Design a protein with these regions (language model features):
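Active-site neighborhood of HAD-like aspartate-dependent phosphohydrolases
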Residues: 1-43
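Helix-loop "lid/cap" segments that line or gate small-molecule binding pockets
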Residues: 27-28, 48-63, 120, 152-153
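Asp-based, Mg2+/Mn2+-dependent phosphohydrolase catalytic module
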Residues: 1-3, 114, 118-216
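An amphipathic alpha-helix signature
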Residues: 21, 25, 42, 46-54, ...
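Metal-dependent phosphoesterase signature
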Residues: 55-94, 102
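Substrate-recognition element of Asp-dependent hydrolases with the DxDx(T/V) motif
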Residues: 92-122
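Generic enzyme active-site microenvironment
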Residues: 6-8, 109, 166
Length: 216
């Protein structure tokens, strides 16, 4: 039986792609850059917002200075609009409630910046107690570096073999492998099944409810 389930946020618990896309496009437009269709952002997100901005900027403009300029426009806009169109994926709220009632610890490990991670989790899952809600924190490497998982394990006081890590991207599968914990790839998120399969996770699922069987 697993004692702790760690979930990625964007593309796993919440479909946030529209709000991320609209906010990035707002920032790009403010600075005179070309914007992108929402669907293209599926392959830009996942490695933190600075990497998102670098990918969104046109060739020849991908400098650190320009990334920071986009970030300056993005943050205040996204902080207001990050829950406009974002929604939990089907079955997620019921799954979290089930795990909580069964006494399983629940945590979030995201590459989204910390303030937005906390806000979205509190907004969409107010009835759920999370052992940890960690986003991108200053001085801590982003996923697939396993530090975020190790920090959660310390708070939860569990062993690696007692953990299931659930995510929708290759970054998540690599994070689980780097941390030495069991991985479950979910196919309803931003990345295709083929990307998940490259990392040979212990589990893959198309339906949130099936995660219950991986816990017990």
């Amino acid at each position: 039986m697993k004692k702790l389930i760690i979930f990625d946020l964007d593309g796993t618990l919440l479909n946030t792609i529209a709000d991320l896309a609209h906010s990035t496009n707002y920032a790009l437009n403010k600075l005179g850059y070309t914007t992108h269709d929402v669907e293209k952002y599926n392959f830009m997100v996942g490695n933190g917002i600075n990497k998102l901005f670098e990918r969104a900027l046109p060739e020849g403009e991908k400098t650190e200075e320009n990334v920071l300029r986009v970030r300056k426009e993005f943050i205040p806009y996204y902080d207001i609009h990050n829950a406009d169109d974002s929604r939990p994926y089907p079955g997620i709220s019921a799954l979290l409630s089930y795990l909580q009632s069964a006494g399983i610890q629940i945590a979030v490990a995201s590459n989204k910046y910390q303030a937005a991670t906390e806000k979205l989790v509190a907004h969409y899952f107010p009835e759920i107690h999370f052992t940890a809600v960690f986003g991108q924190r200053e001085g801590v490497n982003v996923k697939p570096d396993p530090t975020i998982v190790f920090d959660i394990l310390k708070l939860a006081d569990v062993r690696k073999e007692d953990v299931l890590y659930v995510g929708d991207s290759g970054v998540d599968m690599q994070t689980a492998a780097n941390a030495g914990v069991t991985a479950c790839g979910v196919t309803w998120g931003f990345r295709p099944r083929t990307e998940l399969e490259e990392f040979n996770p212990a589990y893959m699922t198309d339906v949130a409810e099936k995660i219950k069987k991986m816990v017990f």
